[in-house]
């Protein structure tokens, strides 16, 4: 399963979906996040979070054995195509920069995506949670 920044932040910020997202992560055989998605989450908590939330980010990834995946040339090509097909201002999915890396990782590995919102549900990727 591929973890999108939106789901990771929902957990860290204890939003409504946090418990369902944490359960999906716990139940998954493997969970990965693009290094670009990790950086996006880290920038958010560094800018908006307190010391506790900053520490929670890395602790959460460690506790749930979430793997940071490097960006490959293949993923860059897939991310570029994702923006052309589903990007902000181009398609209702409105994928942003970070979303395109999540899309590319999920597409390359053929894995479902755990995300918050409706952006990825308007693409050709499989959601990790239906709804």
Regions from the PLM with identified roles:
Residues 55, 59, 63-64, 69:
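Helix-adjacent hinge/juxtasegments
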Residues 25, 62, 107:
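Anion (oxyanion) recognition and catalysis
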Residues 32, 67-69, 128:
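General small-molecule cofactor/ligand-binding pocket signal
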Residues 67-112:
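Active-site neighborhoods of divalent-metal-dependent phosphate/nucleic-acid chemistry enzymes
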Residues 103-131:
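Acidic, PIN/NYN-like endoribonuclease modules and their adjacent C-terminal/linker elements
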Residues 1-33, 46-59, 131:
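Short, well-structured N-terminal submotif of metal-dependent ribonuclease cores
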């Amino acid at each position: 399963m591929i973890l999108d920044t939106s789901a990771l932040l929902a957990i860290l910020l204890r939003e409504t979906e946090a418990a369902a997202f944490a359960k999906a992560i716990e139940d998954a055989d493997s969970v990965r996040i693009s290094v670009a998605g990790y950086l996006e989450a880290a920038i958010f908590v560094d800018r908006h979070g307190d010391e506790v939330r900053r520490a929670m980010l890395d602790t959460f990834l460690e506790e749930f054995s979430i793997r940071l995946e490097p960006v490959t040339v293949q993923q860059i090509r897939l991310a570029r195509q994702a923006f052309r097909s589903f990007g902000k201002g181009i398609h209702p999915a409105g994928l942003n920069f970070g979303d395109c890396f999540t899309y590319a990782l999920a597409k390359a590995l053929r894995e479902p995506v755990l995300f918050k919102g409706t952006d990825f549900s308007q693409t050709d990727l499989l959601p990790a949670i239906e709804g």
